[in-house]
């Protein structure tokens, strides 16, 4: 399988159930416009809600469906948002942010934008950012395809991370998987030359699908294990993977570079 991408099998698995990045058909996509956010406020603790109200205006951005998806607005000014010029990594489906936080701390010179649809996961990450005084993470609540299409400029990202996207295991749902040729092509378009696409999955069938999709994208090539990379790919093992290790689940990782 090595010709499809750099793949590492290791024991472990899974992310919380509330962190899918698999996307339904366009007509079925779950958007969270600003008017809908209040309906889930009760899911946050008082401390989380207070931190959200205090820090979200500075560190967060909510993205709803475009009125005209064929006419995207201006892309994010990441230099202004972070207050500096630095390499930018987009993490799609950050869940509760365990990996996001650890990897951002590991590389303080890299700016990380974490995308997630679920407010509770973002609130957990926001509280950790506030507690640990982490300055190189920003958060987006919304649909990952909307973010890629409307907010990210071509050839602007040093890395994209997609860890444990929803595998949609039933055959009739495979079309809902996030990592399809069109999406991977869009990611490739947003990566700088030499930029990294780092994917991890614990689902064997999805791993085969991802390998095929990556091999079919001409702008990506497998990373050479001996070549230096512009960002770290040392992904921390979460408690969810540790718990599943006893079950014999294996994680497959892919690392591609933009040509």
From Swiss-Prot:
Family matches, as InterPro entries: SAM-dependent_MTases_sf (IPR029063), tRNA_(Gua-N-7)_MeTrfase_Trmb (IPR003358), tRNA_methyltr_TrmB_bact (IPR055361)
Positions of the catalytic residues: 166
Protein name as it appears in the record: tRNA (guanine-N(7)-)-methyltransferase
GO MF term (any one): tRNA (guanine(46)-N7)-methyltransferase activity
Pfam families for this protein: Methyltransf_4
Region (Disordered) residue spans: 1-74
NCBIfam families membership: tRNA (guanosine(46)-N7)-methyltransferase TrmB
Organism: Mycobacterium avium (strain 104)
GO cellular component, one term: tRNA methyltransferase complex
Residues noted as binding S-adenosyl-L-methionine in the record, renumbered to the chain: 91, 116, 143, 166
Pathway listed: tRNA modification; N(7)-methylguanine-tRNA biosynthesis
Record EC number: 2.1.1.33
Top-level division of the source organism's lineage: Bacteria
Catalytic activity annotation: guanosine(46) in tRNA + S-adenosyl-L-methionine = N(7)-methylguanosine(46) in tRNA + S-adenosyl-L-homocysteine
UniProt record similarity statement: Belongs to the class I-like SAM-binding methyltransferase superfamily. TrmB family.
HAMAP family: tRNA_methyltr_TrmB
Function comment: Catalyzes the formation of N(7)-methylguanine at position 46 (m7G46) in tRNA.
Enzyme class: transferase
Keywords, ordered alphabetically: Methyltransferase, S-adenosyl-L-methionine, Transferase, tRNA processing
Residues the record lists as binding substrate: 170, 202, 238-241
Record bears the keyword Methyltransferase: yes
